[in-house]
Structures are given as structure tokens and as C-alpha cells.
Amino acid sequence: MYNTDVVIIGAGPVGLFAVFQAGMFGMKCHVIDAQETIGGQCITLYPEKPIYDIPAYPKIVAEELIKQLELQAAPFKPVYHLNQQAIELNKQGDFFEIKTSKNTLIKSKIIIIAAGAGSFGPNKPPLANIEDFEGKSVFYFINDKNKFTGKNIVIAGGGDSAVDWAISLSEIANKIYLVHRRDKFTASPESVRQLRNLAETGKIELVIGYQLNALDGNNGELQSVIVRDLQNNTHKLEANILLPFFGLKQNLGSLANWGLNVKLQHIEVDNSYYQTNIEGIYAIGDIAHYTGKLKLILIGFAEAASSLHHAYSRVFDGKALHFEYSTTKYGKNGKKK
């Protein structure tokens, strides 16, 4: 059995920043993640997706953000338990014992759940024979955007993923169609502004008021995408790639059986320190829910700092935290004093 101060469930960007923040407070961390590598959705789903709302980075791709967060956490020597899930929780006095799907046992005083969407998978459009095209012409995630160079692409959806990828791929694709059932997008206002500018210049064609209806092609090679409007009028889009971005299916898995207050696949927390209904267990990032919650990586970073600040006295048996700015803990060379 491993003994540590904090167990962090989830090695996405928020979980990785929590490792750094815990290290700044002198806490040792073990991290559990179901994926084979760290990074969460940023690596598994969209490593090349540009992110625009990380402070000091006008633009950074998801993969690079994860690399920087890993480097930031590395001095504190976290222990990663990858390709395994946290499946069992037991309370032993002031300690928690977690068992993973690989029978790893970890004992800690604090648990930080930063599991993002939990176990996730794409919401697939209900199109006949779509599985025949998956992996060849239909993709739900993008790990190498260069393979779409010169292609005619239909992107479906109105959220951040659909809009941001339409903008990004317009630089290399021959043609981009963005299909959305209405003229209102849920992506960030700045992304929508860029999208409409590109539509005005002809770089992107907006197909508004339509939904996906059928696929046409042979042997997994797409030739066209059929869309229809509310009056059942159809329109054919000549394309060899379809990228449907309709969000993710969430599944909390074993976490749902831990006695936590769960609502619609999210864990309810207080909005001061992000503690759950079980003292010593916190939830941060996309998996956490409270009044006024914003699902932004930046907000998750702040939740990590607040929750670990609050957890300090539990880890160190009632000792008060003497708050210091990071500049007082590191020298000019960036090394810990």
C-alpha cells in the first residue's frame, strides 16, 4: 500500500495543476487516471486544438499546455497510476483508502476528484451505417489535423469544438462547411466573431437551419453528406470528411457509488472550497457543480488552489497555512528555495 498526503483522481489540466499546487503547500501526491497517458481530454480528444483563454498565452494547443503543466508539477515528484480507475473507497479513521482497477492501494488524508467528464465518449449522430465510415471519413476527435489538408470537410455542431475546429482547419482544408440547426452558437463570442468573419470571406460556408440526414459513399470513403431542414428539404454537400461535434457522454463509473451528492453526472460541492458532502473529499474542474459554475480550465485552476489551501490543515493535523506567494518560494533561477 502507498501512503501519501493527497490522491488526485484525473490527470487532465486541472488535475496536473492541483499536483503543482499541492507541491507548493508541501503535500505529496499520487495521481490516478484511466487513460494510458496524462492529459485527459486535451490529449485523448483534441491534442492539436487551439486554446485561447489561458492567461499569458494568446493561443496554445492542448498538447503543449499539458507538457507545460507536467513540467510545472515535475519538481514535486508526483506518482502516476495510469491506465487504471479508482473503483473502491474506504474510510479508516482520518484516512481514506482507495483501491484501483489494477488492485493498487493508496492511503491518504485528502482526495481531489478532477476527473473532468469522468469516463467519456462521443455523442454520435443517428445516421444509418455511420460505423462504416468511422475512422476513415468520419472522426469524432482530432489528433493530427494535417491529415485533413486539402479535404472538403463537413463539421456539425455549434459549440466550442465545432467552431474552433472550423476556424483552425480553414487554414489547410479545401472547403469547410459548418452545419448547425440554428444561427445561434454556444462557442465563445470571440470564436463566433472569427467564424463569421471567415464566412464572409468565403473560407467557411455556414449551413444554418440544417441537420445531418445521411451519408453517401463506398467502402468507408465519403463522397457527400446529406442535410435536411425543418421542412424536410434536403441538400447535398460534396465532402470527403465528416466531423460531428455533439459533446461527450459522461459516466462517473464507481465514483457514483461513493456516497457523494451527484446531480446529472456532476458532483455537488460548496462554492467556497469545493468540498463535497464528505469531509476531506473535494471535486474540481468540469466534474464539479455549484451555483455560478463556469466550465473553464482557468476556473479549474483556481478551484485547485482554493481546495488545497483549505485541505492544508487536515493534511498537517490542524496546522495553519502561512500563505506565501510563489515568488518567495522560488529563486530568480526558477528553482525552489
Curated annotation (Swiss-Prot):
<dbReference type="GO" id="GO:0050660">
    <property type="term" value="F:flavin adenine dinucleotide binding"/>
</dbReference>
<dbReference type="InterPro" id="IPR050097">
    <property type="entry name" value="Ferredoxin-NADP_redctase_2"/>
</dbReference>
<keyword id="KW-0285">Flavoprotein</keyword>
<dbReference type="InterPro" id="IPR023753">
    <property type="entry name" value="FAD/NAD-binding_dom"/>
</dbReference>
<protein>
    <recommendedName>
        <fullName>Ferredoxin--NADP reductase</fullName>
        <ecNumber>1.18.1.2</ecNumber>
    </recommendedName>
</protein>
<comment type="subunit">
    <text>Homodimer.</text>
</comment>
<keyword id="KW-0560">Oxidoreductase</keyword>
<dbReference type="Pfam" id="PF07992">
    <property type="entry name" value="Pyr_redox_2"/>
</dbReference>
<comment type="similarity">
    <text>Belongs to the ferredoxin--NADP reductase type 2 family.</text>
</comment>
<feature type="binding site">
    <location>
        <position position="33"/>
    </location>
    <ligand>
        <name>FAD</name>
    </ligand>
</feature>
<feature type="binding site">
    <location>
        <position position="286"/>
    </location>
    <ligand>
        <name>FAD</name>
    </ligand>
</feature>
<dbReference type="InterPro" id="IPR022890">
    <property type="entry name" value="Fd--NADP_Rdtase_type_2"/>
</dbReference>
<dbReference type="InterPro" id="IPR036188">
    <property type="entry name" value="FAD/NAD-bd_sf"/>
</dbReference>
<keyword id="KW-0274">FAD</keyword>
<feature type="binding site">
    <location>
        <position position="86"/>
    </location>
    <ligand>
        <name>FAD</name>
    </ligand>
</feature>
<feature type="binding site">
    <location>
        <position position="120"/>
    </location>
    <ligand>
        <name>FAD</name>
    </ligand>
</feature>
<feature type="binding site">
    <location>
        <position position="41"/>
    </location>
    <ligand>
        <name>FAD</name>
    </ligand>
</feature>
<keyword id="KW-0521">NADP</keyword>
<dbReference type="GO" id="GO:0050661">
    <property type="term" value="F:NADP binding"/>
</dbReference>
<feature type="binding site">
    <location>
        <position position="327"/>
    </location>
    <ligand>
        <name>FAD</name>
    </ligand>
</feature>
<dbReference type="GO" id="GO:0004324">
    <property type="term" value="F:ferredoxin-NADP+ reductase activity"/>
</dbReference>
<feature type="binding site">
    <location>
        <position position="46"/>
    </location>
    <ligand>
        <name>FAD</name>
    </ligand>
</feature>
